[in-house]
Amino acid sequence: MLKKFRVVLMLLCCSLFLVGCGNKSSENSVSEEKQPVELNISAAASLKEVMADLQAAYKKVADNVTLVVNYGGSGSLQQQIEQGAPCDLFISAGQKQMNTLKEKGLLVDETTKDLVQNELVLITAKGVEIKSFDDLKNSDIKHIAVGDPGSVPAGKYADEVLVNTGIKDSISDKLVFAKDVKEVLAWVASGNADAGFVYLSDALNNSNVNVVKNVPEVNEHSPIIYPVSVIKDSKNIEEAKKFEDFLFTEEAQKIFEKYGYKANS
């Protein structure tokens, strides 16, 4: 009888041990599963089309990460970040906005990098015939759309072009100012403005405008560089760094090139 009791007790102990191991294994598998992460990205309005493709591509390599993108003028986004709006990563269309955030200690400094370059172009509405900057002086050109130079990098670059080509004073009464480059594009595409200055990446993806002239950087405007940085107050700094690293991969850079951007050399 005692022998039988010992056998039963031994079997019971083995069963409890196996159950314990199973629970531990189950706990380990749960802990190894990737937890869902939501990253808040603040991106210049001009990035809207390319970001859609980048989001889809990143989902394939990090399916637990959801990218929530807030688009706007770079100056407006800068102010939102300063005021504490949720943001893990910022992609600006100009250095000025990023530099301001850096000076205020709001960035993870080692993550602040130049991502891609863009190009400024002069566009017109369909049916509007101009061939040069001087043609903007023509009496039939009533409205010329530009981004607000104070908050929109494309507007600042356009202002530099108008000053450096010597035509700003003669067309200043025709200028209409938009909150971001997408609004400039919409005004020209709809015919509400006769001409405007946008990025090449915007113009390439809109069949309702004509590209009149590509504006070279030399002597006409400063380089158009899109910097990127992780925000210091991010609650997901490591995940934000991983997404930033992805933006510099060959796959991501090819997506940028498809939309008219250039790799930053």
What are these regions (language model features)?
Residues 56-68:
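Signal peptide-proximal N-terminal region
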Residues 1-9:
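Bacterial N-terminal signal peptides that target proteins for export
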Residues 88-92:
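Periplasmic-binding protein-like
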Residues 16-20:
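C-terminal motif of bacterial Sec signal peptides marking the signal peptidase cleavage site
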Residues 111-120:
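Short, glycine-/small- and polar/acidic-enriched structural segments
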Residues 21-56, 75, 79-82, 94-95, ...:
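Exported/periplasmic ABC-transporter solute-binding proteins
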Residues 39, 65-67, 120:
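Conserved beta-strand core positions
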Residues 71:
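Conserved strand-loop elements at the edges of beta-sheets that form or border functional pockets
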